[in-house]
């Protein structure tokens, strides 16, 4: 119906076999799909919008999915806008800020920002955050920066005292809040894909027992001060799976 650009490839990927594989498992499923269809991650600019969940807080949209919840705005064509429409509009400018790679977003967090503020990494990962009062930050994920200006720690729903003692609060009482949006370079995507580049590997990592978390299993280890010992103490979304060690 001429509502989406014909030059862009769109795909809706359910969790394999109808089983919940977690946001991390779903991301690995995306990587497999892209590699099968494009052959590599070079020259690919990919937007991933995770939209799973039970819609417990908004059950009236469980049938269509939270991503297609209406928002109080009418589009130029006269149709009522949805979260998906707003994502397409707000994220359309990000592609020009990256050579190749993937932007992963959470489908229930609408972000409005100027894409010109983004410098996508040539190699590695970068998270999109914004400054907010520490009182608000204690209810969200917060990034604590190291001496090089990179993310040193990912602190999730910590007290004001903990955030302050860990050096996550600036002189104005602000913290860097995690928005759920993360940029991955093409070479990092290729590295992640090696985890699932055979059917046997895919079966180990993408299943309803491990239920890998995009944030706990992917983002946490990327912080410069993360340790393996602390990572093992993080609570998994699914079962604690010995075979993944």
Predicted features, each with a name:
Residues 1-245:
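Unchanged
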